[in-house]
From Swiss-Prot:
InterPro entries for this protein: Cupin_2, Flavonoid_dioxygenase-like, RmlC-like_jellyroll, RmlC_Cupin_sf
Residue stretches making up the Cupin type-2 domain: 47-101
SUPFAM superfamilies: RmlC-like cupins
Signal peptide: none
Protein name from the UniProt record: Uncharacterized protein aq_1978
Top-level taxonomy: Bacteria, Pseudomonadati, Aquificota, Aquificia, Aquificales
Highest taxon, organism lineage: Bacteria
Length: 121
């Protein structure tokens, strides 16, 4: 699987192979960014903490592995090829249930990590 953009072509499978053995908890790699959108590879070996994004919508697909998405009090099992949409303000977290989950995450507008607000459940 490749990711083609005006700046470069990235081999996503190769990026995953390079990183999968060294991930301890969660690792994030920025793939592309404009003022309107940003794309990340997210490696999750454990679990995210419950949080929401005050100013960003998030769409992600599971490229590898499987896990559970907790979204606004609902739990849904996800596997490779599944997609999720998380609107801004929605409390959520992903919990890996395999050796490693790899997600392709797309934020709109572009995400800088500053609006991730942790919550207690």
């Amino acid at each position: 699987m490749i990711l083609f953009s005006p700046k470069e072509i990235k081999d996503i499978e190769e990026l995953v192979k390079e990183r999968e053995g060294s991930v301890e908890e969660i690792e994030v790699i920025k793939l592309n960014e404009t003022p309107n959108i940003s794309q990340f590879l997210v490696f999750i070996k454990t679990s995210e903490v419950p949080h929401y994004h005050a100013e960003h919508d998030l769409t992600f697909t599971v490229l590898k592995g499987k896990g559970e998405l907790y979204l606004e009090g609902e739990k849904k099992k996800l596997k490779e090829g599944d997609w999720a949409f998380i609107p801004k303000g929605a409390v959520h977290f992903y919990r890996n249930t395999s050796e490693l989950s790899v997600l392709l995450a797309i934020f709109s507008p572009s995400y800088d990590g500053k609006d991730s607000v942790r919550v207690e459940l």
